[in-house]
Regions:
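A short helix->beta-strand "capping" segment at the edge of beta-propeller domains
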Residues: 1-16, 50
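A structural motif specific to WD40 beta-propellers
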Residues: 6-8, 52-55, 94-97
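Beta-strand-rich domains and repeat architectures in extracellular enzymes and scaffolds
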Residues: 10-41
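WD40/WD-repeat beta-propeller blade N-cap
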Residues: 11-18, 58-64, 99-105
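Loop/turn segments within WD40 beta-propeller blades
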Residues: 22-31, 67-73, 109-115
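Conserved strand-to-loop turn within each blade of WD40 beta-propeller repeats
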Residues: 37-40, 78-82, 119-123
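WD40-repeat beta-propellers
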Residues: 43-47, 85-89, 108, 124-132
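Asp-box/WD-like beta-propeller blade repeats and closely related beta-sheet repeat scaffolds
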Residues: 93-115
Length: 133
């Protein structure tokens, strides 16, 4: 049985439906984060246990369908209806990488070593640490 608190949270801020949530791993201090994909095109990073807003990743033109955050919550990835996937510095909110696709990107996932991302809905992926090389 998990010792984590299991209290439902209501997190305001999105103007359209949320379509997906992803969570970081729990760090040594017991802290974890969540990121939301939303039809408003503005994924939000939040404190996992409280739902407190940390920041919004702005740069997609259209609905964001897929999100992920790496294990230590230093990077975030987003996939959207604008045919792109993006990697963000989760600490500063700065966009680090954009991968263009031929179709809507509906899912993004960091690899277990956090070095690469896989993107669903198109056939591209990239090196999350070296600008897609």
């Amino acid at each position: 049985m998990s010792s984590l608190r299991q209290t439902p949270l209501t997190c305001s801020g999105h103007t359209r439906p949320v379509v997906f949530l992803a969570f970081s791993e729990i760090n040594s201090d017991g802290i974890y984060y969540s990121i939301s994909a939303c039809k408003d095109g503005k994924p939000m990073l939040r404190q996992g246990d409280t739902g407190d807003w940390i920041g919004t990743f702005e740069g997609h033109k259209g609905a964001v369908w897929g999100v992920d955050v790496n294990k230590d919550a230093t990077k975030a990835a987003t996939g959207a209806a604008d045919f792109s996937a993006k990697v963000w510095d989760a600490l500063s909110g700065e966009e680090e990488l954009t991968l263009q696709h031929k179709h809507i990107v509906k899912s993004v996932n960091f690899s277990n070593d956090n070095a690469c991302i896989d993107c669903g809905g198109g056939a591209a992926g990239g090196d999350a640490s070296r600008g897609g090389e």
